[in-house]
Amino acid sequence: MQRDFTYVGDIVQGINIILDNTLNAIWVKQHEIYNLGTGVSNELMDYIRCLEDELGRVAQKNYLPMHPADVKSTQADISKTQKLGYEPTTSIRDGIKLFVDWHKEYYKETLISEVRHLHLVKT
């Protein structure tokens, strides 16, 4: 199975470009569709391997047959959005590393806060 995996920072960049162009009414026609993504399809298993590498753990996989309504491969057609200046730059591996680093830091702070709260509540 292949998908167009895109780092959230690249999506935010694209949204900002579309909004800027819409507000300035330079290139963007209102009510049109502007796709965001990388424009490249990648294997789901490659994505999972990158995630496993970054987490230092092997995922427990449960392989199932494809659902009849599922699509084997998808990718965004970003040609219209590229004309506005959108160009995703984050690789899958870099995006996963950025996300895992953020996730660990965010939940470390959340865990520290919860532990402090528990110590304050203790009687």
Annotate each language-model stretch with its function.
Residues 1-123:
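C-terminal substrate-binding subdomain of Rossmann-fold SDR/epimerase-dehydratase oxidoreductases
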